[in-house]
Design a protein with these regions (language model features):
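Short, charged alpha-helical interaction segments and adjacent helix-coil junctions
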Residues: 2, 72-84, 184-305
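Short alpha-helical segments used as structural interaction elements across diverse proteins
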Residues: 10, 90, 176, 198, ...
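Coupling/switch segment of ABC-type P-loop NTPase heads
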Residues: 165-195
Length: 305
């Protein structure tokens, strides 16, 4: 079973809610569209469904599956899924998501219904020997008719850092270093990682100065990068060095500090271990490195009676 990567999901979902306009160039690139940057983007409710899966001990577990990113631009519906690994279930999950979406926008009358299927694509953060180039769902009907519902997948390893910036594919930047996961996690040679992080930092600053990225977008993108770094390093010696490239932690506002203190106080009140509190801090505060989380725990935890 592939390991779950909630940090990747959290970054993707936080980005879509806070900075949906950054996804317009992604939609243009993936689906060969030409929407202007200021086009209206509607985030649609990601209605979930329940599915039964088998756990390691053979028992059954019920999980709710919710699509990553469902948006409407003009009259088109787009479904994007961010995936770190292909676990063999993506095609059927896309089919299930697509039918849920189609039902919301279906039209019908006596004896007839029209069910519009959304355009979809899967964004693979990492490439393995099992990563497919495309996803295809084949519908078969009793009369022998078959219809293929197909889309090319996005594999981030196929993009150069220059292409990401040239096409303004900002949502890809936080996940770009995932291809170096082995080197980063094993404390191997990370010079290539450093070079690419410096490149992205300088380009984001340049585009911010040119007015293409807002203050919040720049700060959050750097924070998202640091979240992925801390996920991969898991506190090893590479963490501080890599996080500092993006300018260290982005937690500077009083509201963020109040939120951090609240998480620590509530965690200690219910008897959570320090490791659990640290995990919650990094889940709730995008871009907070483990070293800073520990410092906040020491600072605010000492004040409790």
């Amino acid at each position: 079973m592939q390991k779950k990567t909630p940090d990747y999901d959290n970054v993707f979902k936080t980005m879509k809610m806070k900075h949906k306009r950054l996804f317009v160039p992604v939609i243009n690139d993936v689906f060969d569209r030409n929407y202007p940057k200021d086009v209206k983007v509607d985030i649609l409710s990601s209605e979930g469904y329940l599915t039964e899966t088998e756990t390691a001990d053979g028992s059954k577990d019920i999980e709710e599956q919710i699509s990553d990113f469902l948006i409407k631009i003009e009259n088109e519906i787009y479904l994007l899924e961010c995936q770190s690994y292909d676990d063999g279930s993506m095609a059927i999950r896309i089919a299930e998501y697509a039918f849920i979406v189609a039902r919301q926008f279906a039209s019908w009358d006596i004896g007839h219904a029209t069910i519009p299927m959304p355009r979809f694509s899967i964004i693979y953060v990492k490439r393995t020997e099992r990563t497919p180039k495309a996803t295809m769902i084949t519908f078969t009907f009793p009369d022998g008719q078959t219809v293929d519902y197909k889309s090319d997948n996005v594999i981030l390893e196929d993009f150069t850092k220059e292409k990401v910036v040239e096409k303004r594919l900002f949502p890809y930047i936080p996940f770009y270093i995932a291809k170096y996961e082995k080197e980063i996690a094993s404390e191997g040679n990370i010079e290539n990682v450093i070079e690419e992080l410096v490149y992205f930092r300088e380009e984001m600053i340049r585009l911010h100065q040119a007015g293409e990225l807002s203050d919040d977008e720049l700060i959050d993108l750097k924070g998202f990068v640091n979240t992925i770094i801390t996920h991969i390093t898991n506190g090893n010696k590479n963490e501080e060095r890599l996080v500092n490239i993006m300018g260290g932690t982005v937690i500077e506002t009083e509201s963020d500090k109040i939120k951090i203190r609240t998480i620590i106080e509530m965690g200690q009140e219910v008897g959570l271990e320090d490791s659990e509190i640290l995990k919650k801090l990094q889940e709730k505060i995008i871009g907070l490195p483990l070293t800073r989380a520990k410092a906040y725990l020491e600072q605010y935890g000492k004040q409790l009676v």
